[in-house]
Every structure is written in C-alpha cells, then in structure tokens.
Amino acid sequence: MSSFGFGLITAAVLAIATVGFTMQFAVTNVLNLAYGSVMINSAYVTYWVNQHGISVWLALFAGVFCGAVVSWCLNRVIYTPFQRRNLAPITVVIVSLGVDLMGTFGLQAIVGGSYVTYKMSQGHEFHFLGMFLSGVQLIIIGICAGVLILIHWLLKYTRLGKAMRATSANRNLARNSGVKTQFIISMTWIISGALCGLAGTVFAMNSGVFEATSNELYIVLLLAAMFLGGPGEPYGAMFGALAIGLSTEISAAYITADYKEVIAFLVLLGMLAFRPYGLFGSEKTL
Amino acid sequence: MSLTSFGFYMSTILVYGAVDALACLGLSIEFGVAGITNFGFIIFQAAGAYTAAILSMPNAATSNGGFQEFVLGWNLPWPLPWIGATLVGGLIALPFVFLVGKRLRGDFAAVGLLVSAVLLNLLVKNYVPFLNGDAGISLVPAPLQNLFNPQSIGYQLAYGGVAIILTVLVYFLLRRITESPYGRSLRAMRDNDVVADSLGKNLRGQRTSILVLGGMIAGLSGAVLVGFISLWAPGAWGYAETIVLFAAIIIGGAGNHKGAILGAILVPLGFEEITRFLPPFGSPSLVPALEWVAIGLLIILFLWFRPNGIIPEKRRILSTIVHRAPVTPDADDDDAESASNIGSVNDFDFRSVLTTAPVVNDHRVMLSTQGLSKSFSGVTVVSGVSISIQQGRLTGMIGPNGAGKSTVMAMLAGTLSPTSGQIFFEGQDVTHVASYKRAQAGLVRTFQLASEFKKLTVLENLVCAIPHQSGDSFTGSLRGRRYWGSEDTSNIERAEEILEGFGLSQYADAYAGGLSGGQRRLVEIMRALLAEPTVLLLDEPMAGVHRNLARKIGNHLVKLCKAGMTVVMVEHELSIMDEFCDPVIVLAEGKVLAEGTMAELRANSEVVEAYLVG
C-alpha cells in the first residue's frame, strides 16, 4: 500500500507536468522536448530564491514565473520563427533537442554538478489507508488537484480556454473566425510554462535532492503519460499521468527499483505502435 | 611530440575519424536521403560494438579470471566478429520497423526511437549477466592480435588504414544507392511520403531496407571502434550521442554523403580533439557541459542560417536536351506565366509517352463502390456512396464544399480507409489493398493540395513516377548504372517529351518546390500520367491553372479517354464539366445526389438547389 502512496505523489507531479506539455503540443503543435530542461531550470530558480532565506512556498512562485517567461521566450525567439519557415515538423523537434541540451548543460555549467536541496521542513508524517505521506507530499497532491481543477475551468468555461481549444483543433479556421491565434499561442506558452515551472519545483521538492541532470529521464514519463491519454488531450494527460505514476512506483515495489521506468517505456512504445492517438482519442486527432 | 607518439596520435585520429564518418554516413542515408529521423541511431552502433566484443572474446567464465559476465564469448577470429557486428546492426533494425512503417507521423516515430535508445541503455546497464552491466565489457581482443603486436605503431597505423578503406567503400556504396532510381524514390519519400505512396512506392519496404542498411553501417562502425579501444560500456552510448551525430550531419550537410563525412570530422572528432588540447579550467564537469551547450547551439544556428549544411545536397541535372540557361521559376508570377510561358499543350499526343498497349473502349465498369462510408470521430463525412466508373469515360464529380468529394477520392485510392463499404477495381475487391499496391495496379490519384517533391527537380519528379523501373529497388540500385542506366535514359527522355508538350522544358532541372502554383498542378498531372494509370483520379487538377490551358488539358484528357484511359475528376469549374465530363456525379452532404450529363443535372431541381445556384 505504501507504494500506492509513492505512486500517487509521483502521479501528482507528473500530472502537472504532462498537462502543460500536452497543451503546448495541442495548441502550438510543438513537441517541445526541452520541457524537462525548463522544469529543472525553474526548480533551480526556486532554489536560489529559497537560499536567500525566503520560504520555499513563496520561492515556488519564482520558479513558476521562470517557467512561464522562459517558455514564452523559447516560443518567441526560437519555435515560432522556425515554424514560420514552413519546414518539416521534425525540424522543430530537432531544434527542441538542441534547446534541451543548451538548457540542461548550460545550467550544469553554471551551477556545477553537485546536488542541492531546498531548505524546508517535510512536515508531519500522515498515516492512513496503509500509506505514509509527509505533509509536503500532501500539499503537492493538493496543489495538483487545484491545478487540474483550474485547468478544467480554464478550458471549459473561459473564453481564453475555448479559444485555445479552437486553435488546437484548427488553427487557420480559428484565425479566420476571429480568434487572435498568435495571442492565444503566446498565452498557451505562458500558462503551460507556468505549469512546467511548478512541476519542476514540486519535482525537486519530492526528490529531496537534485542537480542539473536529475530529470534527464523525465521526458520519457511525460511522453508516456501524454501518449497514453492521447497527444494534445489535457484530460487524457491527467489520466495518463495517474496511470504512469502509479504503475512505475508499484512496479518498483514489486519487481525492482532499477527497472521502475521500464513500464513507462513499454507503455509508450506500445501506444506508438498500436494506438498513437491515445486510449480515448480517434484517428482524426493526428 | 616524438615521431612515434605522433604516429600513435595519427592512428587514433584515423580510427576515430573513420568510426565517426561511418556512423554519419549511416545516419545520412537514413535521415538525409530517406527522411527517417532515427533518434535511436546509437543503439545500432552499440549493438555492433557489443556483438564484435562478445564474438571475439573467449567465454566469460573461463577468461580473464571471470571478472566480467556476458553472453556468447565465442572467441572467433577476425574478421568474423566484424561481420557479425554488421549483421546484428542490421537485424536489430527490424523490430523498429513498426515505428517507421507507414502509419506513424515522423516526429512520433522519432520520439519512439529516442525512447528505445534510453530504454535499451537502461536495461543493459542494470542487467549485468547480459553484457556486464554498467561496468561494460573490457579487454576486448584486438583483431589478429595473436599474429601481430597491437601495441606496435605499424599495427595501429594499419588499423587506421583499414578503417579508412571501409569508410571509403561505404561511401561509394551509399552513393551508388543514392544516385540510382531507387535513391530518387527514397528522396521522394523523404519530401512527401503520402504522395510517394500514392505513386506506388512501398514506404514500409523502403524504410525497412534503409533502416537495416543504416543499422549495418552503424554496427560496423561500432565493431571498428571496439576493436581499437578494447572496451565498451553503457556510458559510451547515451541517447545524446545520437544528437551529436545529428549535429554532425546537419552541419556538414544532410543528404550529401560528403557533407556527412565533413560533419563527422568537424563535430564528433573535432570536439574531441579540441578539448584534448584545451588547458584545464573550471570544474571537471565544466568542459563537457560546455561542449553539449555548443552542440545544441550549433544545431539551432545551422538549422536557421544554413539548413542545408556546409555542403548542401546537390541538384541532379537530368535533362539530356542541350542545356539552356537554367531558369529560376518565379513563384509569385502566377498569372503572367500561365498566359505566356506555359500553356502550349498543343499538338502533343499524351498517349505517345505511355507504354501501355492501346485499349478498345468497351465502357465496362472499371471502378465501383458499394455503400462506401467514412466518419471521423463520430462525424459522418461520406455515407453510403455507391458509384460505378465506366472504362474510357471522363467522369466528373461535383458538389459543394464539404460534400465529401476529396474523401471519396482518397478512399478510392486507398489514402484513407473507409469506415464501411467496399471498393472494387476491375472486379476485384480492393477495400483492404494498400494504396501503393493500387497505384501499382494502375489506380493513380493526384492531390488537391500541392504535392510536388520539393527537393527533387521537375524532371526527377516526373521520372520517379514511372513504374517498373529496374533500378527502383534496393537490389537493382546495387547493380549499378550499367544495369539500369540505359533504361533510365529512355525514361528521362519520355519525361522530357511530356514536359515539352506542356511547355515547361525550361524548368526541367529546377527544383519543383520553386515553381508557381499553376505550374505545380501541371507537374502533378504529368507525373500522374507517367505513372501509367488505367484509372486516373484527379482532385481539382485545374485549380490555379489558366483557363485556356485548363481547356487544352481537358481536351487531352478526353483524347486519353478515347484511347482507353478512365478518368475521374473532381472540379469546381462547371464550364469544364459542361465541356468535357460525361457522366457527372453530384455529391452533397456525403451522399450521391444525382448522376447524369450536365444537361440532365441542370434540369434536376434538387441538384440546382444544392449546388448549381448555391
């Protein structure tokens, strides 16, 4: 049962990250493989602020802000100019890998290779239903629930969210129908970037210690969760994150921790091979 | 530096350079020529290195005090381990065919390969009994080490020489493939795979062959490397090493094998050597970190400022007619050009470029559908369409936007598979026959949207559509120009003839991507004709073509039908329908509304209401 608790917290972090990742893909059509490096950079910004004696829960906002600004800049300076050139979609994917290298190793060049940790208390440990969860972990799950409800509200009930969905479904049609698609795309990068920054910070909190390359494999979990729920489907991403988070931790408990990511890999490859549009998606979404 | 140590240094450079060049060549044929973004390329090099290691090493339990665990250990003499490595590199490509097969988008397949590389590295690292886990395999014997002294300068230089010779051989092999009709098909697939498929190219087959070939080359490169450095471990083949190779061929020039070699010298080798001579500074992780930053930056800068690399892919001049000054088409000058430059489709007989035997028109049913339906996520676009297309007739298809015309055409050609219903071609049920096979059987389509192969010249676009080319297969391409050369020349002449007929000869050697919209439509029609169709499906072929020229083409289509070809044409211009098409099928809201001559349709109030006046 304790592995279920670990799975829940892993899933919570992953859900925040995957929803942002999948929104980027849906609305802006960029498979941004640099997402993980923006996460870890944001986690470091939180760390720097935290080092100056500010509570990590306030510093977290700096991380969120960093994620939003960096993502917006990436789109403005790199992805959009490349997309405007009307190149094969794979070019932008290769570019995002280049960005990922620069982001991850640029950070490593600045901060060095040593592990750091936030100054924070883990809070009381709670014990219920056979699970042990620290106060911090409970807060992370709470943040995750709050974020998912907010995203649901954004997509379902706000003009911005509807415009985002319209842009995702058909960008040209949306533009011709009066949606300011460039603005919507910028907003998507800011919102998904904020989620990315938040995910990076809670990822670092949950890991305890981290360094510049700590989430090197995280992109695989992200991709697995995204493809499980269907690429570009925010609700699918929530489900995918839950499934991947739980299954990696439970398999770690019952098989061996060395292979805990393996299940995510296999899920991802299986989805790509047989249902690349996700469990609930349909052919047309590709 | 003494002469001997310089010699050792040189041999290291030679071997590393050759290994990197081999790897880049393998990636160049996959990515640069065939358009397969193999983000897991390093898997294949690793497989080769491990295979060479465990084939050449003695049994793990009995050798070296048994301090490492691995499978096999067959103690084979050189060159068997290298041959084994090459074969395994190719074999290991086969499981990945499901990712690069026809259905999956290129970027998703790339992600799948990237993830596979990470996964395999993780598995090999953690499962020690297979290949000694994270520590890797060491003390791999050097080739022929019982005959020569591997530490001697002569041996080292000879090793470098062999490596270079192998690289040169691979270079010529790849050039042979790339410059053949098969290479042309590969490049067509790279530029637009859906269209290549519609012209009868077997995408899965082509991609499998090239993935296997690239894997073999990568496997060989791994074998050469491990024989020299005598150890191999998961740390040497992280997924990011593939990105280094991508950086190399992007910088050198993807699609040009010379560029791949240049890239190998500049990036993997250059970076290694430069850092060797850097004075130590900062923390030990600083220099490698900065290297990665530089590689990321170089990828982005090159893709932006010089996307074709230092040595770009060269334009293939095929035309046999005396070279006029190459004309650069002006894509913005649509109207002027269609009125003057082109449009001289005069007395040219299209039939003459086709090699199929003349057919007597019997107006039998060539192509028919039974209750054909298609829905996308619950929205029904085509429902219950049953039509029959008669031989030797020019059948028109009209209908308001969204009536399902293009969807019907796509289902007829096999680009889309129907949700329900059946399609019969010459009496055979072809509902589940792959689109490329339908094209090979003579059911050829064109596309509503521009579908030229951008980085093939106009002439290459045309020639690559010609069916049954003996050089258009993997084995055919290996047999060389002597085997397919004369046939290719006559194919080129046929293509030039039809190009002349359309008045586009001056653009023969220009990239098709640079043509104007109207010219591209014409290239597409010519290309479809050269594919030797018995039934030709034209999706708005006249869009953007000058009215006078459109009428001339219409006349020629009628002539082709009289000579036995069957044509189905979707068109919005009713005057064209009036003049050339009989019968005409009207689609509305996914259903067949009416069928008959245009005169009959104009008398049908339902049709007039749905379409003609709307």
Where are these predicted regions, by residue range?
Chain A
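Membrane-interfacial amphipathic/re-entrant helices at transmembrane-helix boundaries
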Residues: 1-16, 45, 54-59, 85-91, ...
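Inter-helical junctions in multi-pass inner-membrane proteins, predominant
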Residues: 1-13, 155, 188-225, 232, ...
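Membrane-embedded helix boundary and interhelical linker motif in transport proteins
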Residues: 5, 27-73, 77
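Short, non-helical or kinked segments that cap or interrupt transmembrane helices
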Residues: 21-42, 56, 86-90, 160-163, ...
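Alpha-helical transmembrane segments within multi-pass membrane transporters and channels
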Residues: 54-99, 239-244, 275-276
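Transmembrane helix-bundle core of multi-pass membrane transporters
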Residues: 81, 88-157, 184, 250, ...
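Cytosolic-side transmembrane-helix boundaries in multi-pass membrane proteins
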Residues: 110, 169-176, 180-183, 255-286
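Helix-loop-helix "hairpin" substructures at the membrane interface of multi-pass membrane proteins
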Residues: 132-210, 234-240
